[in-house]
Amino acid sequence: MSDYKRLSPNLAVAGQIQPGQLEDIARQGFHTVINNRPDNEGDDQPSSETLEQAARAAGLAYYHLPVTPGEISDTDILGFAGLMQQSRGPVLAFCRTGNRSSSLWALSESARTDPKTLIATADQAGYDLSKQEARLQQRWRAGPGAQPQPGHSAATTWDVLVVGGGAGGLAAAASLLKRRPSLSIA
């Protein structure tokens, strides 16, 4: 298994892994695996229970912290940060593509690390965290003492919501953008 991307000395992320890869993951020096995929998310996906059995047989600690794509809550961030703190040795976190795991890492580090650094690090690894930038900035401004609120989810916000995607809705969105190009419209 060599298709993981290192984000820090103690964390690498990857796309979906298979049970047969876990012995190789252990040989590469990882001590902990964090699975960020909900079970039954895809047809090609082994169950968390199957992965846990293979991880333990390979001598790895295994944690399942399922996160729905696009819905990372403050509780998820706290959970990921807690797992990183309690894990011994290098950690491999994975999801379908590695993007959720890299987002969880950046959000859990954002109170202590400048968002531009986090985004650049993820970008070098091939992950685009630009959609998380506002949330990263918010957590950075709040600082290390600020705690996420369990149950809170910083959903994406928009300046304008156009209801109806037909010709009228598209014309309204185009007209608004022509007048104010900086608007975010959904």
Stretch-by-stretch model annotation:
Residues 101-102, 169:
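Catalytic nucleophile loop
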Residues 95:
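Short cysteine clusters
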